[in-house]
Amino acid sequence: MQTPPQPLSSTSPNLILITTISLIILLISILYYHSIKTTIPLPPKKSYYSSLIKNYTILSWESSYEKAKKFLEPLPLKYKISLLYGTDNMLESSQKNIGCVGKLDPFFHKESNTIFNGMCLNDGPTGVRFSNGTSISWNSPLNTACTFDKKLVYKIGKIQGMEFYEKGINTILSPNLNIMRSPLSGRAWEGFGDDPYLISIMGTLFVKGIQDSGVIANAKHYVGNDQETYRRCSNSIIDERNLWENYLRPFIHVIKYGDVGSVMTSYNAVNGIYLSKNRKLVLEYLKEKIGFKGFVVTDWWAIYDSNPDYINSGVDMNMPGGKAYGKKYTGRDRSYWSYLDNYVRNRKVKEKRIDDAALRIIATMYKFNQMDNFNSVNFSRNTNNDENIKFQRKVAADSNVLLKNEDNILPINDKIVKKIAILGSDAFERDCPNERDFNCYTPKNPHYKGHSPIGYGSGTTTFKYLITPYEGILKRAKKSNIKVVSHNKLTEKGEEDIKTSIQISKDSDIILIFAHSISGEEYIRSEGSCGDRFSLTLLHNIDSLIIELSKINKNIVVIINSPGPVNLPWKDKVKGIIYSGYPGSESGNGIADILFGDVNPSGHLPFVWSKREDYCCDIIKTKCNETEKFRKKYRYNGSPNMEEYKYSEGLFIGQRWFDLKRIKPIFNFGYGLSYTKFTFKNLNAEMKESGLFVNVTVINEGNVDGSSVVLIFLTFPNYVSNFPIRVFKGFEKVFVKKGESVICHIFIDDFSLSYYSVEVNDFVRPKKGEFVVFAGSSAGIEDLKLSVKVKADF
């Protein structure tokens, strides 16, 4: 199958002709595949992904495996086993607030003069965890997805990879490929949204960036770990078609196109069997059918007992060592993996399974040139340099999504606006014992007070600094001689102080209200919740503040920091709304750049936004203390008494559900405004053996330069039954100067044109009928569409 060639944007017909001819020559020379066979082939040497700039040589799997075999050949069994389990239960790391979250110890085999330098694994998706502020605290992956900028996503991965490389970290535990099945999902901010195709593309670009820096990426959490409540004792019930079409597709993509080096099994069970001992999903599907060649590592403490089924089912590495918090967990217990030699002697585990696991781990390290001359672990190496900080600010700005701009209230015009009010505790410094630690929630400190630049859990980092919205706006307002007033105190009930806020801001020319919601992993308590959100309501009763202020001043802009959709009962009462997500350490500068027009907003929503009851799926949610009591008695980790999550919605997640049920959301998938006006026209599409080639003309009819995102949706041929009405299958971001136009080229490859057939137990490309192609700036725009016939000989 062919991966997309690098997109071009141009107004020159000659360049288009030359480009088209070049593409045809390239495509003819490459062998294409039309379905996933027993082992998915490696991607073509020339592809969109391989055309990205890199400065690191990556070996082929064949060469890596040969080197690994020679390395392992003289080693006794106990040395091979030592490669399969961690030696740090993370207590040391967390207490010091610095260090690897998982590691393999180095060793020296004297008889063969064999040296192994060890392996360091570390979180995560927003930068180097436990780095004590010596590296960038990045935006959330959900913000990354908001940019819809392929080159930007790759560069984020590349710079993050370089930071990990400098510190001697072999494996970065990212990206998270789970789907925002429910907007309440606690770790939704760690992923790339609610659409499998978008997650596939974003994940692959991120993986390529990381691994082009010489660091192993880790695709997680395999699979169906789409909620936090009872995650260690839950059962995701997913039918075969849905499993392959939605939940395995992103993993297939990062393996096929990203060549990802490692995959992490999740805590939950799928169809009754916990993932770390699910032979069907790990060994048969991931390794054999999909053709994954790297190593499989458990999520931390996802080994629940001493059953040899875990390693026999295909798991290669147990992290951080020992079994998990089962009924008799004893802290540093490593009994299971460290005594694998007993299982081999008792013939419960075959020695060739040990050999295979060790081979996969060492081969992956050889592939990324980590076996010789790799940096020693040193978390104090500073990568928080000016260049990286400047880029993080750009990402923070580019990931803001403008949702409403009535009367062009934005950008702030300093000829009109002389006084700004900044309200809402989310705009100001945080109230935590350690202001740089975003996992500061305890029973004594259960409320989140202050700005939310990131969620909580293993995905966060220790911030060296944080530019709050108040700081960023105040600094920028001074340049325009605009007065700033503010109020950030909460009442004793933990609510916004409405009376004082009104008094301070009533005569302001514009009121900026910062509102937030917070979520994360289940092991941390915040606002009475353990991970998943209770509701989509914003914190601290800020809805009441917004409504009351709107009665006396209509010039209100609400900026939302949240892990996804929130309720907007005041939507029609304010003039401006911005979704800012979790933008990282440069949050305040990024939002100031947008508010004052220094950056034209170009972000788009990577999820559909509506009321809780409108979505396909919900999450069983109880108070945190009630969940803990129930779990201790009935649903301990790895318990056979599982909480069931039935994925009965089938293929209809995200925008697809709203299309099926004809529900009009508050904001469609892909929605996002700009300070200029874009128009799309001249949709053309041509079906070829390699895939579908689409062209769209993008015109900037406004007075400001800007970037536009073209989204492509497809309706599959009618005979593909019980399939979504439209599926998202392509996008590109193009920069267009004011008064000019460009032609946006989008390629949809063979795999993306395929659907999973339960009849043939494989992905199949339609051989008859026609596709309907839709082009627009969001799922709600259907102005441009055309039909393309399928050719049977493809």
Regions found by a protein language model. Name each.
Residues 784-788:
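Edge beta-strands of extracellular beta-sandwich domains
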Residues 1-11:
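Short, low-complexity, Lys/Arg-enriched N-terminal segments of secretory-pathway carbohydrate enzymes
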Residues 14-17, 22-781, 793-794:
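Glycoside hydrolase catalytic-domain context in secreted enzymes
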